[in-house]
Amino acid sequence: MVMSAYPSIRERLFRLAPVASTESVPVLCIRFLLILMSLLVIGVMIAFGVKPVGMWMHRHRFILGASVIAACVLLNISGSSIGMWNYWLGHDMSTDVVWGTPRIMRTDEYVVGTPLAFSQSYSGYSYFNDLFGNKPADMFIVKDAPVLALAELFRPFHWGYILFGSSRGLAFYWSARLVVLFLAAYEFFLCISNDRRQEKHKGVAFVGAILIACAPLVQWWFAVNALPEMLIAIFVSIVCFDRYLGDTESGHRAAYAAVILICAGMFALTLYPAWQISLGYLLAGLILCIVIRHWGHIRISRKDALIFVGEIALFCVILGSAVVTSWGTIQSMHTAYPGARQSIGGGLPPLSLISSVGTLFFPFKDYAVDSVTTNMVEASRFVDLFPLGIILAVFGMIKRKKVDVLSAWLIAVIALFSVFACVGMPLWLSKIMMLTSVTSGRCVVVLGVANIAVLVRAA
């Protein structure tokens, strides 16, 4: 209603008339290149075969990923809905849009997050910014904006703003997170597949990575609450932990440990307990399963231990610097929200657990709200094909007459959070299980990731 009424209000109150749409030459060229590249990939696969091309892309996946990021930064391509400002100011909101349409619902991105990130260039990327409110605002903890601080090491996707400026920094922020999320999910699914030599499950891992990176839930929430960072931190840390235990060279282990600690800092600084706690259950089980996989072959030398202790100390110093600087902000966060939340779950319609495929169509048609969800963002899901993964996993364990620890843990996580989200539990039990900060609607993230993981594992 607001969107339909706004044009007349804009013209009468602000004297702003809509401007005719014009397609710029750069936008048309970018569209042509995207279509050309897609057709080129299809043509190469037809000419040389899907498997050889797929293996070539697998071998060069990191170079290809870096090339995509570089191209997006060079061409200033992002997924921001900042074009909505053209609409509010009486212009054509499709101006400079290569594909899709700006989403009015993503106000927390184009009204809050992106403008705050841009504002940092006017303060020299300072930790506190006095452009908002009656006192300097903590841009690192609350605003999740780029700052020049040691702890920014744990937020590598902000580096583009500092290195390239606001426009190309925004392009880096969007493209790097999507590419890295896809590659991290791909490596993770290769790691947890039943094929330890990772030769037969590349196609399955590719499909799993698509289901994660292109999930409706991930895309609707892409620019807020750091969901991609949480998933990247989990996937990369598990892959590095697996390689840490399987490698004996101290230099390699030092690098793996450093990446794991960066992921730990990234996960901690997302500061969204509703997702962090539920995903923490998943992470704990994955760590345990990796230890079981390498049990009996784990060797930690004194040199490895000393290096790891040194890296832990450096990690604590860097993270501690942010805690000390933002101590007042952190104390405030433990008052009304999220510190005072006392969730007991319940209220999620069980039917929503098996209706994830329908959320693929949300971008094409407005979603009719019901009593539980209020918009397309809240109703979005991972296309996890529940309960297919569980059925395949159970059938496989029965056929092999052997319990698969990882599949069993994933099924247990799915069962726990399905009951918590749909039925609920007493407050005392919710406190014991540290779920009071987790709402029913936010459980769909861990459910989606766990369902996709068990599906890939069982394939």
Please tell me what each predicted stretch does:
Residues 17-25, 321-402, 406:
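Periplasmic/ER-lumenal interhelical loops and adjacent helix-loop junctions
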Residues 18-23, 168, 172, 217-229, ...:
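Membrane-helix boundary/interfacial segments in multi-pass membrane proteins
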Residues 27-80:
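Start-transfer (signal-anchor) and selected internal transmembrane alpha helices
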Residues 65-139, 304-364:
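Aromatic-rich transmembrane-lumenal/periplasmic boundary elements in polytopic membrane proteins
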Residues 182-191, 201-294, 304-329:
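Membrane-embedded helix bundles of polyisoprenyl
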